[in-house]
Amino acid sequence: MQMDHKQVMRALPHSYPFLLVDKVTECIPGECIVAVKNVTFNEPFFVGHFPGNPIMPGVLIVEALAQASMLCVVCDADGESTGDTSVLFMSIDSARFRKVVVPGDVLVLKSSVCHRRGNSCRFDCRAYVEDVLVTEAQILAMMNK
């Protein structure tokens, strides 16, 4: 399953400038997802992070991974939100920032459900630029119906 930016905007509760997923290139709902964030110089966070040396803040890379993870569990096989589930993030574990992300990079976000118990779900997340691992983390979320 794939999703364009309009489907992403309908499925996520976020809006600009905090919407950090541009499209979904692959998804098996409830199992795994591959999404894309095109990092442009016009991102508002580059104004102060850092003047003359713009670097995407690591916490925003993790947020992009969290948004992709949310799409994985709230969308059906047609790429539309099921509308009956909200996702609240509970913790970020084992976050590692391996390389910087700069304007012009295409951030590929990969997330897989690695464990479910009750209404909680743990995701194994990785972000890549040109097939190079830049960030990894485990995200724990609670799903409310």
From Swiss-Prot:
Its main location: cytoplasm. GO terms for molecular function: (3R)-hydroxyacyl-[acyl-carrier-protein] dehydratase activity. It is found in: Cytoplasm. Pfam families: FabA (PF07977). One of its GO terms (biological process) is fatty acid biosynthetic process. It catalyses: a (3R)-hydroxyacyl-[ACP] = a (2E)-enoyl-[ACP] + H2O. The active site is at H49. The keyword GTP-binding does not apply. GO terms for cellular component: cytoplasm; membrane. InterPro entries: FabA_FabZ (IPR013114), FabZ (IPR010084), HotDog_dom_sf (IPR029069). Belongs to the thioester dehydratase family. FabZ subfamily. PANTHER family: 3-HYDROXYACYL-[ACYL-CARRIER-PROTEIN] DEHYDRATASE. Involved in unsaturated fatty acids biosynthesis. Catalyzes the dehydration of short chain beta-hydroxyacyl-ACPs and long chain saturated and unsaturated beta-hydroxyacyl-ACPs. This is 3-hydroxyacyl-[acyl-carrier-protein] dehydratase FabZ. It comes from Anaplasma phagocytophilum (strain HZ).
